[in-house]
């Protein structure tokens, strides 16, 4: 399926950021975006769900939509509905794209106009850090640590491009939503982001994973390109990251329970891996792997909520379908 067309950058891509009650991050993001090649002629869309409207300098190519509320998936759908370009490039307000980010996106889109979802590389901000790989059933995910004890997650540093048309593990094989380019034609055909998923929603995460599995299930082209690079400036304490990971677990489990019930093999493989890992954690006897009772309760609640959410999504999916993007 031919998704896009060959056209100049400023008519091809809209940059979109979704933010809520993070004025400092949004100001820093806006100041940085102006340094990117081609950003002065590229439409920029800010979906702000803050309690108070953002006060950032205006520009002719900037549109701010202030919609107080919660829900990253809902905000992404607003961006998809409002944008008029064939592609929407999403990044988070704590991400800093490289100078040639737009150029790299445009190059891939011209070479592969059939692509429905395109993921880019996400590196930690700064220079004095160490990368760590967490091995899973489908490869590995990456996080970083600094000497001051802070850590950074939601990274993707693979050096090799990838190209898929059947379901794979999205995080290990493609990337995540903090550096994601979406073809509007694809979501017009197969629907937008599921609003129960993602930050601010009751299932807390996984909206990017779900839409990737859905499009791949339809045979759409999803790609990863390491030259489309940005830096993730989201350093936090290990305790803070652990709390974040509990939320991620809810969304990830919900998505994979849902898709396992739909018969998607990669979802079943993920669930088998997660439950085997959970059994090892609960049964650990040595001090190195033993977890506190507080951790086990929090993770157990996340597992239960994710399972309930996945079954609920499966049931609702039969009747309501997916958000329509016109």
Which sequence ranges carry the predicted segments?
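Short, well-formed alpha-helical segments that are part of the catalytic scaffolds
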Residues: 17, 21-37
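Conserved donor NDP-sugar-binding/catalytic core segment of glycosyltransferases
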Residues: 100-147
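Glycine-rich, basic loop-to-helix element that forms the pyrophosphate-binding segment
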Residues: 67-83
